[in-house]
């Protein structure tokens, strides 16, 4: 049976992640409070952010930029700033 969570991003009950994707307290928070649907939406934004800003995941500063954007997007209702991107209406 699928595990459900009250998703902080979607503000509704939804199927949760199958397992904790990120280690530590942040990973636990995501596992407990973010749905699979919201995580998939974040992954799309993350890919766009990495590509647009030419971030390198080996660089600690770039990983911090991604982590801050992820927390803002998933928990604080902040949109990811991606230059040149216009969302579909």
Curated annotation (Swiss-Prot):
Keyword Iron attributed: yes
Keywords of the record: Iron
GO biological process: cellular response to oxidative stress
MF-aspect GO terms: iron ion binding
Keyword Transferase: no
GO cellular component: cytosol
Highest taxon, organism lineage: Bacteria
InterPro entries: Fe_traffick_prot_YggX, Fe_traffick_prot_YggX_sf
Similarity-based family: Belongs to the Fe(2+)-trafficking protein family.
Function (record text): Could be a mediator in iron transactions between iron acquisition and iron-requiring processes, such as synthesis and/or repair of Fe-S clusters in biosynthetic enzymes.
Name of the protein in its database record: Probable Fe(2+)-trafficking protein
Organism whose genome encodes this protein: Psychromonas ingrahamii (strain DSM 17664 / CCUG 51855 / 37)
Organism placement in taxonomy: Bacteria, Pseudomonadati, Pseudomonadota, Gammaproteobacteria, Alteromonadales
């Amino acid at each position: 049976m699928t595990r459900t969570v009250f998703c902080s991003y979607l503000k509704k009950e939804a199927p949760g992640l199958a397992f904790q994707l990120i280690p530590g307290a942040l990973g636990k928070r995501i596992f407990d409070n973010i749905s699979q649907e919201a995580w998939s939406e974040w992954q799309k934004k993350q890919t766009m952010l990495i590509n647009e800003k030419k971030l390198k995941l080996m660089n600690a500063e770039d990983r911090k930029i991604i982590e801050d954007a992820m927390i803002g997007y998933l928990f604080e209702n902040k949109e990811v700033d991606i230059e040149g991107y216009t969302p579909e209406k």
